[in-house]
Amino acid sequence: MSSELSETEKRKLIRERRQKKFSNGGASARLNRITGQAENSQLDTESPLDSKSSRETTPTVTKVDSNTEEMDELLENIATSPSNKVEKSQKKKEQATSPQETIDPELEIFKQLAENQQNDVSTPDLFSMLRSMKDNMAKSAATDTNPPLEPVDQQLLDYNNYLINNLKVWSIIFKWCFFLIPYLFALTRSEPISFLPEQFSNPSNFFMIFLSFEIVATSIYFQKLQNIEKSNKINGFQSNNKIVNLVSLIPEGVLPVPDIKGKVIMALQYWDVFSMFLTDICFVLVMMGLFKLI
């Protein structure tokens, strides 16, 4: 029993000596001898046993600090009134939308070019010239775009077409029945009619009389046609003509002719009048042939 106690005491003494030796800085030297590390090496071979006493434990206060900051912000939000919150949000929005974002990049380039040419007196102001060109292009683009036409009521359009056709029929009946047929009948008779003036009975004056009558009758017809369209506020050619509808599909600027739709409408109106004149000439030729046979 005494031998065992002496053996344990011996081990205890050895352990205490070793700990004392390590506490005095011998752990690092022992580690160097075990690993074969040179004395002037830059590798860190310091034993954790030597630095254990010199290290100080820092309290972990980061989590506590963050929690206290969040509590402070929460209390500040509760204390502030809603009006102050709105003002703060508006200030943040104003700061977010800086004036640099609204500046046109093209104008910035023009300004830089103008600043580079300020020293040269012979050249004009490039910035003002380019800016005026840009404004003119914007104005021309705004004027070229035709506003879309309002849809026309179909019943009103049908009524307008009915009035126009009625006017055309009555004008033809008046010209043929009350002037052309009696005049051609009197002109083709071998015996002169006493109650007619000499100018009307002379065949050489036929073309002048016929042309004058056509001009007066066509002018009256065209004036009545314009009155009907103004009263109904409908342009028959613009709303009911297939050619005008096809021309309206052509965008502005494609053809070199400006306002091609308006010119087509005017040409169709002239053709309507001229076609009535051609119809009267054909009627005169037919009636003269019939009266010659009688």
From Swiss-Prot:
GO terms for cellular component: endoplasmic reticulum membrane; GET complex; Golgi membrane. Residues 34-65 have a biased composition (Polar residues). Residues 1-166, 226-272 are cytoplasmic. Residues 188-205, 294 are lumenal. GO terms for biological process: establishment of protein localization to endoplasmic reticulum membrane; mitophagy; retrograde vesicle-mediated transport, Golgi to endoplasmic reticulum; tail-anchored membrane protein insertion into ER membrane. Required for the post-translational delivery of tail-anchored (TA) proteins to the endoplasmic reticulum. Together with GET1, acts as a membrane receptor for soluble GET3, which recognizes and selectively binds the transmembrane domain of TA proteins in the cytosol. The GET complex cooperates with the HDEL receptor ERD2 to mediate the ATP-dependent retrieval of resident ER proteins that contain a C-terminal H-D-E-L retention signal from the Golgi to the ER. PANTHER family: GOLGI TO ER TRAFFIC PROTEIN 2. This is Golgi to ER traffic protein 2. It comes from Vanderwaltozyma polyspora (strain ATCC 22028 / DSM 70294 / BCRC 21397 / CBS 2163 / NBRC 10782 / NRRL Y-8283 / UCD 57-17).
